[in-house]
């Protein structure tokens, strides 16, 4: 797996003749996650598989055309994979109000262990979320033609993930928003250019 990941990131275009075997295998490796528990070994394997898929998309954006829809769908599912944490918007709002009202004494103590690290510091599920978002980013940046469909189908899901609790993942999400905006502008500019050419030829 590590060798395949290195090859995909360096000379991924060479893998194009074998994508029909490679992509389904990588998809299977990223699907072995338990919904009720975060297991480090499974997370590491899924992260490697997803990172390899991301590299393949960036190196072979046209060759993966038949697989993009499934990869995007799966990535949006995995970008919310956080079995050890329960998000509660109402509680978050209350906590923000409490933080604004206190003087900072005892700030965040309940969220940290004795050594000052977050209690869930050993939870590696964030690596799966970050890698899955990176796949979405790879698609929107290399396949601008897919952006409109992604926005129509998954915009609400991606916006909801801004609540992500891990900074590394949140940065990847914001980068993806940036990629969506950039690719959308490129598509509009291309369409405008085609319209102008069509009008000038009349």
Outline where the language-model segments fall.
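Karyopherin-beta/Importin-beta family HEAT-repeat alpha-solenoid scaffold
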Residues: 1-202
């Amino acid at each position: 797996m590590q060798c395949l990941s290195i090859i995909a990131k360096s000379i991924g275009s060479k893998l194009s003749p074998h994508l029909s075997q490679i992509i389904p295998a990588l998809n299977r490796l990223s699907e072995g996650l338990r919904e009720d528990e975060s297991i480090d070994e499974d997370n590491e394997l899924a992260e490697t598989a997803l990172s390899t898929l991301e590299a393949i998309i960036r190196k072979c954006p046209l060759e993966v055309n038949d697989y993009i829809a499934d990869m995007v769908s799966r990535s949006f599912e995995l970008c919310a994979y956080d079995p050890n944490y329960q998000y509660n918007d109402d509680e978050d709002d209350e906590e923000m109000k409490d933080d604004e009202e206190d003087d900072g004494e005892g700030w965040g103590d309940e969220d940290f262990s004795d050594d000052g690290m977050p209690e869930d510091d050993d939870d590696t599920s964030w690596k799966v979320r970050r890698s899955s978002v990176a796949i979405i980013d790879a698609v929107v940046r290399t396949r601008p033609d897919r952006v409109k469909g992604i926005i129509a189908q998954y915009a609400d899901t991606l916006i909801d993930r801004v609540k992500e609790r891990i900074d590394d993942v949140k940065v990847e999400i914001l980068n993806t928003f940036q990629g969506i905006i950039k690719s959308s502008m490129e598509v509009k500019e291309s369409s405008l250019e085609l319209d102008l050419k069509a009008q000038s030829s009349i």
